[in-house]
């Protein structure tokens, strides 16, 4: 099923960009349903502190369609960064004052703004179609809102600032669901979490956790060997 829409978004500070499922390709329908039904505790055991503490941030979970079908936009953070250095992640970052209300339009604007700043994509070609519950990253104290997007009109992307971003790339969903690329990432602390072997790197941590849950609840997950473990470098 494919919907039809002429909706386009031109970002304006503190104005809520439209969030709509109109015009989505049929294969994204299961992901859109996840956004409307999933509970925070189904995505992660790390939830925002009840005290309200934590730095409000947002990431753009951007789905596109490439030569090998559905794909996700990802980036590798620069190895010199103070937090999450060298990790593969979604585009995103902390909310700025001009993004607006952290409990309303703020995460939507921040996700698009940060994606443009980090990858050079044109936000006008992105259709937002859902928002996942806010989650928490204890090591960096970020309260993160994953914003779901459809790359309706793809634009060139690159690592805009090499001091922050090492590279920008897309990964086919088929590679993420391939059991051969699935693993359990073992942190030196003893923490175990989902991992993906993609683009000659290990995708783990918060980003891997969100992808793992999306694949599961969208019904895209394939059986894989959960006993296969990859130890993380002690610096991770």
Task: Map each language-model feature to its residues.
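N-terminal leader/linker segments that precede catalytic domains of diphosphate-processing enzymes
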Residues: 1-90, 94-155, 176, 186, ...
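NUDIX/MutT-family hydrolases
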Residues: 160-197
């Amino acid at each position: 099923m494919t919907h039809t829409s002429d909706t386009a978004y031109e970002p304006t500070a503190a104005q809520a960009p439209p969030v709509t499922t109109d015009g989505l390709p049929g294969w994204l329908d299961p992901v859109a349903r996840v956004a409307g039904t999933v509970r925070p505790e189904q995505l992660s055991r790390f939830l925002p502190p009840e005290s309200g503490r934590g730095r409000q941030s947002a990431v753009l979970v951007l789905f596109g369609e490439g030569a090998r079908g559905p794909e996700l936009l990802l980036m590798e953070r620069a190895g010199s960064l103070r937090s999450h250095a060298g990790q593969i992640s979604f585009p995103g970052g902390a909310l700025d004052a001009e993004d607006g209300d952290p409990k309303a339009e703020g995460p939507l604007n921040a996700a698009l703004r940060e994606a443009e700043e980090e990858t050079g994509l044109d936000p006008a070609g992105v259709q937002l179609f859902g928002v996942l519950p806010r989650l928490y990253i204890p090591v960096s104290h970020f309260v993160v809102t994953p914003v779901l997007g459809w790359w309706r009109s793809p634009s060139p992307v690159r690592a805009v600032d090499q001091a922050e971003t090492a590279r920008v790339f897309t990964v086919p969903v088929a590679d993420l669901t391939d059991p051969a690329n699935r693993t359990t990432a073992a942190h030196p602390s003893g923490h175990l979490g989902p991992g993906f072997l993609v683009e000659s790197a290990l995708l783990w941590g918060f980003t891997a956790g969100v992808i793992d849950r999306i694949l599961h609840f969208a019904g895209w997950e394939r059986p894989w060997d959960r006993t296969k473990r990859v130890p993380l470098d002690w610096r991770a």
